[in-house]
Regions:
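Sequence/structural segment immediately N-terminal to covalent heme-attachment motifs in c-type
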Residues: 31-41
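Solvent-exposed loop segments that connect transmembrane elements
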Residues: 96-110, 145-152, 202-210, 253-273, ...
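The canonical Cys-X-X-Cys-His
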Residues: 39-49
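Outer-membrane beta-barrel "beta-signal"
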Residues: 41, 437, 463-477
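Detector for outer-membrane/organellar transmembrane beta-barrel domains
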Residues: 290-427, 431, 443
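C-terminal segment of classical bacterial N-terminal signal peptides
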Residues: 19-28
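Outer membrane beta-barrel
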Residues: 53-54, 81-94, 107-252, 274-290, ...
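Transmembrane beta-barrel architecture of outer-membrane proteins
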Residues: 29, 116-120, 157-161, 225-227, ...
Length: 477
C-alpha cells in the first residue's frame, strides 16, 4: 500500500525541481525553430507559450510561412526542430481512496509529492515554401498509465497542423487585406488562432497525476490525436474570420495523425463517420493600440460509433455549439489577457441507447446511457497578468453541468442518478527567468466533483479531497 507523505517530502521535491530548472536554464541557449525561422524572439508570438499575441495569430494564419525556409537555393539556414521537456511535483490533498471492488485503501496519485520527469516533445515546425508550412509534435508521456492503472512510458503524435495559404492585397495595402488557406489537423480547435478554444486553452499545463472530472464535451479533447480534419478559412482585414472543416477517423492515408494511439482495444480511440463531422468557426476581432479583442462562435457535429472496432452500427450524435471571447492588452512592462468560452453539447444516443434497451448493455466500450438524450455544458473563464513578460499570475474558473444519467455516471448513496456536475477554480503563478524556461506553481480547487460536494463516490470521498498543488518546470530549446 502506498502511504501518503506529508509536507517535508513535498519540500524536498520543490527544492529538487528548482535545482533541475537551474540546470535546464543553463542549457536552454537556443530558441525554438519558429523563432529561428523569423529572427524574432519568442515573446513576439507568445504572451507565454502557447498563448498567442496578435503577431502570433498572424503568423499562424499565414501558414507559418513568415521568414526563411530551413533550406533554400542559397544553402542550409537552420534546423527546423524544437524540443520541450517538463519535470514536476504533484500534491493531492487527500491521496487515499477506497477501492470499490476490494474495499482496500489505495492511493489516488501513485507518485504523490515525488519529483518526476513528466515528459518531453519534439516539434518539426517550419515554413516549407511561401505558401505552405506547418508543425507536428511528437510527445513522450512518462506518466501514461496502462489498463491496470500502472504508470508506463508511452509516446505518440500530439497536435499537428499543416497549412496551404494565399494572400490578396490591394494596391496601397501594407499587409494582405485577405488571407485564405486550407488546414489539415488532428484535433478540432488546434487550428484556431485564439486561446479561448479548448485545444490551446487554459490551463496550458496541468498535472497528469491529478484526478479530474469524468465528463467533457467532444470538442474539448474528446477527439484529439484520433481524427483528421480538412478545411478552409478566410481572414479579412484582421477583423472577420470564418472557417469550415470536416473530420474523419484518422485511418488509412491519415493514420499518421493518430500514431501511437491504441487502435486495437475497444474504446482505445474514437471512430467517427467518414467526413460527416462538420466543424465551423466564425469570429469578429479588432486591434487598436496595445489592445485586441475578439468575440466569436465555434462548434461541431460529431457522428461517433460506440465501438471503434465495429463501424457497421449506427452512430451517436453529439452537437457542440460554443461562444467565446478574448481580450489582450500587451505593453512593456504590463500585459493583461482574458479568455472565456461556453460550450453546449447535445448528446443523442441513437446507437447506444437503442442497444441498452434491446440488450441491457451498450455496444462495445459504450457509452451505456439510461437516457436517449443528454446535455453537457462547460464554462471557462480566465484572466492573466504578466509583468515584464517574466512574472505572471492567473486566476481561472471552470464549470461543467449536465443531465443526470445513471448509465453514464452511476448512482449516489441515496439511489439517485448522478450528474457530471463539477466546478472549481485555478490559481497559477509563473516565473520565466529566460523566455524559453517557465517555472509554475498551480493550485486547483474543487467545489463540486462528479456530481457532488461531499461523498461523490459513495465511499466518503469529497470534492475538495482532489484539490491539487502542482509545481512544474518547463523548458523549450
Amino acid at each position: 500500500m502506498h502511504l501518503r507523505r506529508t509536507g517535508p517530502a513535498f519540500g524536498r521535491g520543490l527544492a529538487l525541481t528548482l535545482l533541475l530548472c537551474a540546470g535546464m536554464a543553463g542549457q536552454a541557449n537556443a530558441v525554438p525553430s519558429f523563432a529561428r525561422q523569423t529572427g524574432q524572439e519568442c515573446i513576439a508570438c507568445h504572451v507565454s507559450f502557447p498563448e498567442l499575441t496578435p503577431y502570433g495569430r498572424y503568423f499562424k494564419l499565414t501558414g507559418y510561412t513568415i521568414g526563411k525556409a530551413p533550406l533554400t537555393k542559397e544553402g542550409f539556414n537552420f534546423v527546423p526542430l524544437a524540443v520541450m521537456a517538463q519535470a514536476s511535483v504533484t500534491n493531492t490533498r487527500n491521496n487515499n481512496t477506497t477501492d470499490p471492488d476490494t474495499g482496500d485503501t489505495v492511493p489516488v496519485n501513485q507518485r504523490n509529492n515525488d519529483l518526476v520527469f513528466t515528459g518531453a516533445s519534439v516539434f518539426l515546425a517550419s515554413k516549407v515554401t511561401d505558401y505552405f508550412g506547418g508543425f507536428v509534435q511528437w510527445t513522450y508521456d512518462n506518466l501514461a498509465s496502462n489498463a491496470d492503472g500502472h504508470l508506463v512510458g508511452h509516446s505518440g503524435i500530439d497536435n499537428a497542423d499543416f497549412r496551404l495559404v494565399g494572400r490578396y492585397s490591394g494596391a496601397d495595402a501594407e499587409i494582405p487585406e485577405l488571407i485564405y488557406g486550407m488546414t489539415l489537423n488532428n484535433n478540432p480547435t488546434a487550428q484556431d488562432p485564439w486561446n479561448s478554444t479548448p485545444a490551446f486553452g487554459f490551463p496550458y499545463t496541468s498535472s497528469p497525476l491529478a484526478s479530474t472530472p469524468a465528463a467533457a464535451t467532444q470538442i474539448d479533447g474528446g477527439l484529439g490525436q484520433q481524427v483528421a480534419g480538412l478545411g478552409g478559412y478566410v481572414w479579412w482585414k484582421k477583423m472577420v474570420y470564418a472557417e469550415l472543416s470536416v473530420y474523419h477517423t484518422a485511418n488509412n492515408g491519415f493514420a499518421f495523425l493518430r500514431s501511437g494511439q491504441d487502435t486495437h482495444t475497444d474504446g482505445g480511440v474514437a471512430a467517427i463517420q467518414d467526413w460527416n463531422n462538420p466543424y465551423w468557426r466564425f469570429a469578429l476581432s479588432h486591434e487598436w493600440g496595445a489592445n485586441s479583442a475578439m468575440i466569436g462562435t465555434y462548434g461541431m457535429i460529431v457522428n461517433r460509433y460506440p465501438s471503434n472496432l465495429d463501424t457497421s452500427t449506427a452512430t451517436d450524435r453529439y452537437r457542440d455549439v460554443a461562444v467565446d471571447a478574448q481580450y489582450q492588452y500587451i505593453t512593456d512592462p504590463h500585459t493583461f489577457t482574458a479568455q472565456a468560452t461556453y460550450i453546449d453539447e447535445r448528446q443523442s444516443y441513437n446507437a447506444s441507447y437503442a442497444a441498452v434497451q434491446d440488450t441491457g448493455a451498450g455496444i462495445g466500450a459504450g457509452p451505456t446511457p439510461d437516457n436517449p438524450t443528454d446535455t453537457l455544458k462547460t464554462f471557462k473563464l480566465k484572466g492573466t497578468y504578466y509583468y515584464d513578460r517574466k512574472y505572471g499570475a492567473t486566476v481561472a474558473y471552470f464549470s461543467t453541468t449536465g443531465s443526470a444519467d445513471a448509465g453514464l455516471y452511476g448512482m449516489d448513496a441515496d439511489g439517485n442518478a448522478r450528474t457530471p456536475n463539477s466546478n472549481g477554480y485555478i490559481v497559477e503563478l509563473d516565473y520565466l527567468p529566460i523566455q524559453n524556461v517557465r517555472l509554475m506553481l498551480q493550485y486547483t480547487a474543487y467545489n463540486k466533483f462528479n456530481g457532488a460536494k461531499n461523498n461523490y463516490d459513495g465511499s466518503g470521498r469529497n470534492a475538495n479531497d482532489n484539490n491539487t498543488l502542482f509545481l512544474n518546470a518547463w523548458v523549450a530549446f
